[in-house]
Amino acid sequence: MEKIIKYELTINKAIRASLEYGTPDEQINAFIRFLGKEIGADRIYIFEDSQNENITNNTYEWCADGVRPEIDHLQELSMDVIKWWYDCFEKGESIIIHDMEEIKEDHPDSYKLLSGQNINRLVVSSFGSDCEIRGFFGVDNPPESDFRGLTVFLDMIAALIVSLLKIRNKDIESKRMARF
């Protein structure tokens, strides 16, 4: 229970930090930046799935000092590379990798993709709406102390991510409509 309260306080602080910014993109970036620093991770990211193709795109990323951004290399990523993640997401499960070597034999494509980014461990949860997975949100190289708790934390954040992305999409649509 103590951890849940800590997570809720962290989320509230992240929301407050994000509300200091004027645009949805700035708010999302501030939100994940705050969480990344608070968690002590190397990288936090959001991937949004294409509704028309079997691809996913890294749309937001925060990196700790000294960590190389990967967002530019993770556009139009075939979902086949991480199909097993989606199989887990469909069952309501998160991805927890304590040691990248654990997946080397069973998931060689995923291993190659992830180890090439200097990822040793990660926790990833899906987000969605209307009972459909729309993407995922992950943390690379989090502290090893509480992986299970981190999945609870990410599950709590998922609804907020969906809300922030919906606000962003409405903002984009209203700007597009204003041009006509």
Locate each region found by the language model.
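Signal-transducing coupling segments at domain and membrane junctions
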Residues: 98-121, 141
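Signal-transmission linkers at sensory-effector interfaces
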Residues: 1-26, 37, 170-180
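GAF sensory/regulatory domain recognition
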Residues: 45-90, 134
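Amphipathic alpha-helical "output/dimerization" segments
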Residues: 145-166, 176
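Short beta-strand-to-loop transition segments that serve as allosteric relay/switch motifs
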Residues: 135-145
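A short, aliphatic-rich beta-strand micro-motif
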Residues: 120-128
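Short hydrophobic/glycine-rich mini-motifs in sensory/regulatory modules
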Residues: 127-137
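Helix-loop-beta substructure at the N-terminus of cytosolic sensory domains
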Residues: 20-59, 67-69, 121
